[in-house]
A protein has these predicted regions:
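Non-catalytic, mobile gating and regulatory segments of ester bond hydrolases
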Residues: 1-163, 170, 174-183
Length: 183
């Protein structure tokens, strides 16, 4: 059976100029965003190649063997190793009952990918998931919109793709639907 690791081997020598960004690329970066980039990725863009060895390797619910393997492969492949990562945030606020995490990837000179993380392993994260069923707007959605507005404040008129897994997908859709059309 073909899997994401087979895909990564197939495109290892293709740049994003050779083969445009596609859903499988986004899937790999969405999975990577679940890893702990706390205190590693700031507002200063850094290459994935340089960051990969610094990511904590202690296994837990979010830091799985497969996610670490994806990260290690991305760091070796022409397609991903020079991607610049920035603006990682992991904000868990018990008072607001908010669990929010996101990161920006610069894939080419004019293409950015913002990935919103889905639910993590915190009680707050799961509680916020349940709030999605009956609240008009949850705190993480507000934060996702702020994150996107901040991106455009620093990168006006840039091409950006929004993505996320599970709740992260909801955050991407929410931010895209609420942002001013002029941006």
């Amino acid at each position: 059976m073909v899997n994401i690791f087979d895909y990564l081997k197939d495109v290892a020598h293709d740049s994003f100029y050779d083969l445009p960004l596609n859903e499988l690329d986004i899937l790999t970066l969405t999975e990577t965003t679940y890893l702990s980039f706390d205190n590693l990725v700031s507002t200063v863009p850094q290459r994935l190649l340089d960051l990969a060895p610094q990511v904590p390797r202690e296994p837990n619910m979010l830091t799985s063997k497969n996610r670490l393997q994806i990260l290690d492969e991305l760091a070796q492949h022409k397609r991903f190793k020079n991607c610049k990562l920035s603006h990682f945030i992991n904000d868990i606020d018990p008072e607001l009952q908010k669990q929010f995490a996101a990161m920006t990837y610069r894939l080419t000179l004019d293409t950015y990918l913002i990935v919103f993380r889905g639910t993590d392993d915190s009680i707050i994260g799961w509680k916020e998931d349940f709030h999605l069923t009956y609240m008009k707007e949850i705190p993480a959605q507000k934060h996702a919109l702020r994150y996107l507005k901040n991106f455009f404040a620093h990168h006006p008129k840039q091409k950006v793709i929004l993505a996320g897994h599970s709740k992260g997908g909801n955050l991407a859709i929410y931010a895209a639907s609420q942002i001013e059309q002029s941006l």
